[in-house]
Regions:
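Rhodanese-like catalytic fold shared by cysteine-dependent sulfurtransferases
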Residues: 1-41, 49-91, 102-150
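Conserved G/P- and acidic residue-centered "switch" motifs that form tight phosphate/ATP-binding loops
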Residues: 45, 99
Length: 150
């Protein structure tokens, strides 16, 4: 079994255990490996433009807001924007701050006919620690994975 297959199978098993409606749930390190090794894999960052500008993001990702800043109002054009930028047959990985919005995006994309959707658990910044700070408990940045500041 190849590395990509093993990672995707683990993510699919996780999704079954978590009773998720989309294909799989990846850890940040697994998502990074998929992006490096799986031809055609696409990372969709669903954080707000403000988050991308102020906090940073993953180079080469497609940015489509799930909700807009300020106010975190749902983006009524999310699926239309996704369809303009991402083929429905692509292996699509969704990322947000901590995994919540990306879960919603992966669910919506699956319902809209995307067949290979994965949520990146822990998100870009991870969960808050005891001092209410992010970037120390899980997440893309805390894992030391590549990212860029705008």
């Amino acid at each position: 079994m190849g590395k990509i297959t093993a990672i995707l199978q683990a993510a699919q098993q996780r999704a079954k255990e978590m009773n998720l409606s989309y294909e799989g749930a990846l850890l940040p390190e697994e998502a990074n490996e998929i992006l490096k090794s799986a031809p055609g894999a696409i990372l969709v960052d669903v954080r707000t433009r403000a988050e991308l500008d102020w906090i940073g993001g993953v180079a080469g990702s497609v940015g489509i807001e799930w909700a807009t800043y300020p106010g975190m109002k749902p983006n009524p054009h999310f699926l239309a924007q996704l369809e303009q930028q991402v083929d429905k047959e692509s292996l699509v990985l969704f990322l947000c701050r901590s995994g919540g919005r990306s879960h919603l995006a992966a669910t919506a994309a699956t319902q809209a006919g995307y067949s290979d959707c994965y949520n990146i658990l822990q998100g870009f910044e991870g969960d808050m620690n005891n001092e209410s700070h992010r970037n120390t408990l899980g997440g893309w940045r805390a894992a030391g994975l590549p990212w860029k500041q705008s």
